[in-house]
Amino acid sequence: MSDPNMDLNGRVYAITGGALGIGRCLTEELTRRGAQVALIDKEADTGRALAEQLKREGGNVLFVPGDVAEEEALQNFVGRTAETFGGVDVLVNNACLHRQGLLTPCGYEDFNYVLRVGVTAPYMLTRLFLPYFRKGASVINITSTRAFMSQADTESYSAAKGGISALTHAMAVSLAGRVRVNAIAPGWIDTGAYHDPAYRPDYTRADAAQHPSGRVGTPQDIFRAVLFLSDGENSFIDGETLTVDGGMTRRMIYTGDEGWAYTV
């Protein structure tokens, strides 16, 4: 298993959606361990503030404002990253969003916007970064357990996550011998503290108990998974999806089990 305190000095990570949530955690943790980080996010003020904070701490960070749903923004991100760092060791396709589904309803433009952010952008960025990937480079796609299970009215997000999951194994085969491509499927990850510094979680006993691990996930859980998959010592892992959900999707529950009932 990769050491979460490993020195990443000189390694270049490119992260989409790197200003908030899981992406912010990755940006902070990787930079503080010596990695050079390029991030893109449409939250321009938040992204700039994060980059400036990390630079004051001695980090080497490039923030590029932009919406990954737009091809021009993707090209600009790749160009700026290559110009600043020369090459890339790890691309983390993290950005996504949801705009509900059939019951809301989610219309044509909204549905396609989610797919552009969650599927088209990862494909295009991988393609655009190809000339700049260094030896032993890897792509890590952030999918979700919602790629293979759902709640009602989540079609836009589920479709995007299903798409990036399929894209992962397809790209791994296409880039065999050049770039490893893997995915991480988070379950319930509480990102509140990476949106609001004053946030304090307030979980019920059931919130924790529904996870066989006995707790709700944190962005650091995903950070550790990113370290693991991007470690060159784990080069035999390719085209795989690593589920990080505390075992939640492995628990089978029928109505009447463990005091649980389905309301109809």
Show which residues each predicted segment covers:
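Short C-terminal tail/terminal secondary-structure segment
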Residues: 2-5, 149, 238-264
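Canonical Rossmann dinucleotide-binding motif of NAD(H)/NADP(H)-dependent dehydrogenases/reductases
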Residues: 7-38
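Active-site helix of classical SDR
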Residues: 126, 160, 168
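Alpha-helical segment proximal to the catalytic Tyr-Lys
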Residues: 131, 172-177, 235
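Residue(s) in the substrate-gating loop at a strand-loop-helix junction
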Residues: 144
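C-terminal helical subdomain
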Residues: 183, 202-237, 244-246
